[in-house]
């Protein structure tokens, strides 16, 4: 998708070879409600989904010449229906957080959604995920609804929305 930035990160499409590395992060970051490897493979196969990831071009790029598998710092999935994109998953490896990687990945996903004809993006986030809510709010997402006890008793989902204007992407 894009060349490496000065920090040595590359935003690119996910491949099947990346799923094993992604699953290690997914289970670590979402131990209770992790996506399955089947869900990632199905997302890769569906034309209404877009899956990308951020990889490091640093010393841990050890799998193959294209960096598949090793060095995965973050990944995201959007699905598209009509003029709306849903941000289904955005996860940053714990040791790569607070470095702007989530912001870069979100920007790439929003650009991909706009290129595919989306006019708005919706997402849901746990009400106690303060860092994610701040990331989304900083990128002009606004809370439009709340689903009480959505994840579990006492764990609400905040529904957020952002318009994609003609200048985005």
Q: For the regions a protein language model found, what residue spans apply to each?
A:
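Conserved SAM-binding loop
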Residues: 11, 124-125
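Short glycine/proline-centered loop/turn elements that form peptide/ligand docking sites
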Residues: 106, 129-132, 149-154
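Conserved catalytic-core motifs of GNAT/GCN5-like acyltransferases
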Residues: 122-124, 137, 142-159
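Acetyl-CoA-dependent GNAT
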Residues: 3-9, 13-97, 103-116, 163-167
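Conserved hydrophobic/aromatic "anchor" residues
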Residues: 30, 40, 75, 135, ...
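A generic structural signal for beta-strand entry/edge sites
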Residues: 82-84, 120, 157
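Well-formed, non-transmembrane alpha-helical positions, independent of function
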Residues: 21, 134-135
